C-alpha cells in the first residue's frame, strides 16, 4: 500500500518544486541556444523577410524566454529558501506572463501560417525591385548581395521562377537575370558563370525553380522547432504554476504554526491568555446571574 502522506508531505512538495525548476532552467537554456542558432542561421537572409515572418521574431522570442527563465528561477529559489511570500508572488506573476506569451505565440503561429507565407511572398517580390535597405542602426545593405547568397545556397532563381527578374530596376529594358541564377553544373570551372544571366536565349542554364517554396519551407521547418520549444515550456510552466501555489500554501501554514508555537512557549503570553480567559469566565458568570435575576423578576410580576 502506497503511503500518500510520505510522498506528498510539505518537505516533498518543496523538493518537487525545486526539481521542476531545474527542468525549467534546462528548458530555458535550450530555448536560449535555439534562439542564438536561429539568429545566426537566418541572419544572412533577414532583409528579405517581412517583420511578421522574420527569423528575428522567432529568435527573439526564444532568447527573451531563455533570459527570463533564468531570472524567474532565481526569484523562485530565493523566495522559497528565504520563505519570502513577496518573491514567491513575483515568481507566480512571471510564470503566468510566460504562459500567456507562449500560449498566444503558439495559437497565432497555427492560425496565421498561410497568411504569413503570403506576406513572405509579397515581401520577396517587392525586394526584387529594391536595390538596398537601411537597417535600424543605419547600415545600408545591398539586396543584390543577399539575393545572390540566397539563390546560390538554395539553388533557385527569383520568387516563383527566373522570370521575376525580367525588366527589374537593375535592367529595366532586358530579360536578364542575376548570375547567381545560373546552374554551375552547366559551366566549366575555367569560364565560370560570369554574365551568364545576360543570355536570354539560354534559359535552360538557369535554376528553374523559384526561391519562395524552398525559402518558406526552410523557415517553416525552423519555426516548427520553435513551436515545439514553446509547447514544452507551456506544459512545464503550467506544472510550475500549480507547484508554486502549493508551496505558497505550505509557507503560509508553516508561518501560522511558527507563530502559534511561539505564543505557546511565551510564558507572558500564556499567563495573559489565562488571565483573559478567567476574566471572560467571570463576565460570563455575571451575565448568567443577571439573566436569572431578570427572569425571576418577570415571573414575580
UniProtKB/Swiss-Prot annotation:
Mode of membrane association: Multi-pass membrane protein
Mutant lacking the gene: phenotype: RNAi-mediated knockdown in a sma-9 (cc604) mutant background restores the production of the 2 M lineage-derived coelomocytes.
Major site of localization recorded for this protein: membrane
GO MF terms, alphabetically ordered: identical protein binding
Keyword Glycoprotein attributed: yes
Known role: Regulates cell fate specification in the postembryonic mesodermal M lineage and body size, probably by positively modulating BMP-like Sma/Mab signaling at the ligand-receptor level. Promotes ventral fate specification in the M lineage, probably by positively modulating lin-12/Notch signaling.
UniProt family annotation: Belongs to the tetraspanin (TM4SF) family.
Protein name from the UniProt record: Tetraspanin-21
Species for this entry: Caenorhabditis elegans
Native organism taxonomy: Eukaryota, Metazoa, Ecdysozoa, Nematoda, Chromadorea
Gene: tsp-21
Amino acid at each position: 500500500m502506497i503511503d500518500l502522506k510520505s510522498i506528498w508531505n510539505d518537505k516533498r512538495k518543496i523538493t518537487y518544486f525545486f526539481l521542476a525548476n531545474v527542468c525549467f532552467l534546462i528548458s530555458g537554456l535550450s530555448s536560449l541556444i535555439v534562439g542564438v542558432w536561429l539568429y545566426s542561421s537566418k541572419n544572412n537572409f533577414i532583409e528579405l523577410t517581412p517583420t511578421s515572418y522574420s527569423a528575428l521574431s522567432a529568435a527573439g522570442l526564444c532568447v527573451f524566454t531563455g533570459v527570463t527563465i533564468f531570472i524567474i528561477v532565481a526569484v523562485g529559489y530565493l523566495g522559497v529558501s528565504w520563505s519570502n511570500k513577496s518573491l514567491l508572488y513575483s515568481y507566480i506573476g512571471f510564470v503566468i506572463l510566460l504562459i500567456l506569451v507562449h500560449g498566444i505565440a503558439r495559437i497565432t503561429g497555427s492560425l496565421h501560417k498561410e497568411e504569413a507565407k503570403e506576406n513572405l511572398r509579397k515581401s520577396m517580390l517587392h525586394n526584387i525591385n529594391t536595390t538596398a535597405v537601411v537597417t535600424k542602426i543605419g547600415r545600408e545593405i545591398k539586396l543584390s548581395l543577399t539575393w545572390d547568397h540566397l539563390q546560390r545556397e538554395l539553388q533557385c532563381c527569383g520568387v516563383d521562377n527566373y522570370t521575376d527578374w525580367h525588366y527589374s530596376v537593375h535592367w529595366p529594358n532586358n530579360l536578364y537575370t542575376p548570375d547567381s541564377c545560373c546552374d554551375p553544373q552547366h559551366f566549366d570551372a575555367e569560364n565560370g558563370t560570369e554574365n551568364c544571366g545576360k543570355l536570354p536565349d539560354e534559359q535552360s542554364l538557369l535554376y528553374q525553380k523559384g526561391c519562395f517554396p524552398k525559402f518558406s519551407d526552410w523557415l517553416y521547418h525552423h519555426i516548427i522547432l520553435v513551436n515545439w520549444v514553446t509547447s514544452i515550456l507551456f506544459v512545464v510552466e503550467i506544472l510550475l504554476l500549480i507547484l508554486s501555489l502549493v508551496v505558497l500554501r505550505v509557507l503560509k501554514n508553516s508561518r501560522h504554526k511558527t507563530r502559534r508555537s511561539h505564543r505557546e512557549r511565551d510564558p507572558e503570553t500564556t499567563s495573559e491568555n489565562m488571565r483573559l480567559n478567567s476574566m471572560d469566565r467571570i463576565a460570563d458568570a455575571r451575565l448568567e446571574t443577571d439573566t436569572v435575576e431578570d427572569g425571576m423578576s418577570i415571573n414575580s410580576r
